Amino acid sequence: MSDSERRSAAPGRLRQMEIYVTGAGGTRPRIPVQPAALEAKAASAMSAQAAAYIIGGAGGEATMSANRGAFDRYRLVPRVLQDVSKRDLTVRLFGRAHRAPFLLAPIGVLEMAHREADLAVARAAASEGIGFIFSNQASVAMEKCASAMEKAPRWFQLYWSSDDEFVRSLLRRAEDCGCEAIVVTLDTTLLGWRPRDLDLGYLPFLLGLGLAQYLSDPVFRAKIPASPPETGFRPRGAKILATVLGLKRKGRAFGLSLREMRAAVAHFTATYSRPDLNWSDIERLRGMTKLPILLKGVRHPEDAAKAVALGVDGVVVSNHGGRQVDGETATLDVLPSVVAAAKDMPVLMDSGIRSGADIAKALALGARAVLVGRPYVYGLAIAGQAGVGEVIRNMLAELDLTLALCGLTSVSELGPECLAKN
């Protein structure tokens, strides 16, 4: 079966029978279908530092728990005796038809999970006909990922640097490589308090990881100082050798010496954060790109209303997967109020989605589409491109079957009447 034929077939039974038939031959799925088992297997495939960074959250991880708890509180209410022999998962976003109502979320530093990083994800997304949002903190430059995706949908996530010239350069590159929207992440103007990473003393960017968009950018490179600033800090111990070798290796990949690479990391840390980012910057952004603009990290209806007033094209209800503020509201709980305030503006949602049933619940509460994050990274850690592809197919399959078993034939039929709240 060709890729196009596979995509047009009902993904639920197709994937289900693929697993059962190979199982009858003695082969179990290499990518666990159960979310908890998927996370556990991925954790065992990664270093302790990578697992902490990817799996962990802010503070006591109460927000992460709240995200999952919100999905548990909502229950789908199936209808019976409906003709569900044909189902339609497609949605339209900003003039483009998408195979399914989810995209792969922007997640940085994917080289921690697998050596092929973003490139493996881009190839898997393209093969499955699913959109991918390139991370600002990617391990592979956006142009390489775009080339791998050919005509498949891709967007670009922007972390607004304190250097506007660099921001403009990123936006130009995104336009030039075929990105179809800009997703401005608003909830990381400062880094959240993440105990798992703090206990390990681990921030990947200081090791030169997750900086591909920077090290490949002409504006950023032109501003790298001749040598790193003197901090007075003198690291000691055996691990410093591994750090130096890692920086040297990373610099070599971008044509930079060790000294230049250390200076590049210092320049990144000096310009990354924008705690003064405000609504006037969003107004200016309209003049900086011709692409649709989405604001990611909106949780309050008044912020959604402000986005509408400024002519923003969409918002993403997100709490960064529980990685920024500990003890805040779950995104699913605030989704309906944001949808109401957004009026006709598309609202997407992420944080806590682990299954096709979760996607159905988010759509029923008004999300036009969702972003899937950690699950595909777990697939990447276990089996690279193939692992990402399996996670995507499992998501599609469960969503398709959930839709049918709820008596629905299209994701557009999902609404509040399809849910009961415990």
What are these regions (language model features)?
Residues 67, 199, 331-338, 380-400:
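C-terminal helical cap(s) of enzyme catalytic domains, especially alpha/beta-barrels
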